[in-house]
């Protein structure tokens, strides 16, 4: 493999990624992917499909391969541009695993034991509590630190992992000098937090066992309409369409989704639906979401059917990523005391 020289940019470096372990949801799109697209002009963006993370839970090999390509096509369909951003598959850049092993030796067992996501996933995957699941945050730290990342878009469930990444980087720097940049969380100006349709007190998750809670990006729009029309609201009589997360979580979630799709503000939507029934709100949300997904899926099919294009994007993205990653890994190896490869 011939590696390109690393590109030098004056823009802040951003790293983020998604697992190919399940269908991405409108929550992933509105809360992450859409923001990634918007960041491309102002940031040096590195976007990864984190298949190494995916295997901390058992995967069907053929399905994992399919979902990796599905995810790549979705990235492109959402507007992530390989001419503006570096897009690659994690396992195509071996420096992620190499740096992860080195960082393991500067991470304490107690730190990993305190990670709340490990506790949650251990309960969910009780039959497969493997070392990779325990060690997941160190690989995430390697993902971030490998590219001298300035900012990381993170959700609530990953904030603790980013803090650990910062701690590992600071510990390493204190021992060996300024090897790593200390990454900061990226806090978007505005971003929809899409909640479960049937239980709007919890975040919509692609791993939810109850599929009625989830709207997938590749789901049949007719199925989406049915799910939204069954979504939880409340039993107020007469109906009151008002934004109040504490008292009206279901209604607030539908307003958030509609606002995220149409661009209308919450106060505008509250005014629009004054005196109307919950069915009117659900109908508007269903129409907006199904329309958005129909357009997205059309673009997705165009990319997904072009296997040669996907291969080119993966190949070029991995070459660009490796060119950067090797620079950082060489500095780390030299600092640790490894003999350079002749």
Curated annotation (Swiss-Prot):
Keywords: Aminoacyl-tRNA synthetase, ATP-binding, Cytoplasm, Ligase, Nucleotide-binding, Protein biosynthesis
GO biological process: tryptophanyl-tRNA aminoacylation
A Pfam family matched in the record: tRNA-synt_1b
Classification via CDD domains: TrpRS_core
Catalytic activity: tRNA(Trp) + L-tryptophan + ATP = L-tryptophyl-tRNA(Trp) + AMP + diphosphate + H(+)
Cysteine disulfide partners in this protein: none
Keyword set includes Cytoplasm: yes
Residues reported to bind L-tryptophan: 143
Binding site for ATP: 19-21, 27-28, 155-157, 194, 203-207
EC number in record: 6.1.1.2
Keyword Endoplasmic reticulum included in the entry's annotation: no
Cross-referenced SUPFAM superfamilies: Nucleotidylyl transferase (SSF52374)
Domain of life per record: Bacteria
Function: Catalyzes the attachment of tryptophan to tRNA(Trp).
Family: Belongs to the class-I aminoacyl-tRNA synthetase family.
NCBIfam families: trpS (TIGR00233)
Subunit structure: Homodimer.
Name the record gives this protein: Tryptophan--tRNA ligase
Organism in which the protein naturally occurs: Yersinia pestis
């Amino acid at each position: 493999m011939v590696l390109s020289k690393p590109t030098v940019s004056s823009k802040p470096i951003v790293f983020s990624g998604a697992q190919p372990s399940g269908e991405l949801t409108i929550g992933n799109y509105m809360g992450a992917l859409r923001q990634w697209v918007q960041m491309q002009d102002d940031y040096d963006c590195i976007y990864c499909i984190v298949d190494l993370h995916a295997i901390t839970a058992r995967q069907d090999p053929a399905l994992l391969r399919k979902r990796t390509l599905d995810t790549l096509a979705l990235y492109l369909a959402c507007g992530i541009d390989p001419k503006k951003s570096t897009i690659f598959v994690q396992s195509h850049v071996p420096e992620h695993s190499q740096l992860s092993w080195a960082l393991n030796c500067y991470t304490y067992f107690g730190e990993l034991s305190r990670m709340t996501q490990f506790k949650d996933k251990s309960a969910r995957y009780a039959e497969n509590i493997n070392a990779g699941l325990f060690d997941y945050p160190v690989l995430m730290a390697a993902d971030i630190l490998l590219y001298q990342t300035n900012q990381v878009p993170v959700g609530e469930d990953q904030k603790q992992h980013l803090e650990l990444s910062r701690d590992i980087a600071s510990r390493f720097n204190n021992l060996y000098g300024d090897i790593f940049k200390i990454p900061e969380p990226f806090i978007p100006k505005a971003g929809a937090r899409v909640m479960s349709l049937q239980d709007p007190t919890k975040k919509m998750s692609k791993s939810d066992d109850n599929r009625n809670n989830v709207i997938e990006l590749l789901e049949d729009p007719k199925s989406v309409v049915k799910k939204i029309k069954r979504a939880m609201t409340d039993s107020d009589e007469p109906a009151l369409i008002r934004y109040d997360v504490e008292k009206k979580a279901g209604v607030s979630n539908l307003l958030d989704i509609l606002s995220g799709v149409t661009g209308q503000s919450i106060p505008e939507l509250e005014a629009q639906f004054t005196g109307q029934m919950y069915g009117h709100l659900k109908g508007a949300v269903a129409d907006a979401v199904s329309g958005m997904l129909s357009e997205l899926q059309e673009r997705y099919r165009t990319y997904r059917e072009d296997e040669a294009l996907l291969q080119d994007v993966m190949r070029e993205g991995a070459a660009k990523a490796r060119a950067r990653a090797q620079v950082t890994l060489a500095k780390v190896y030299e600092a640790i005391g490894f003999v350079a490869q002749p």
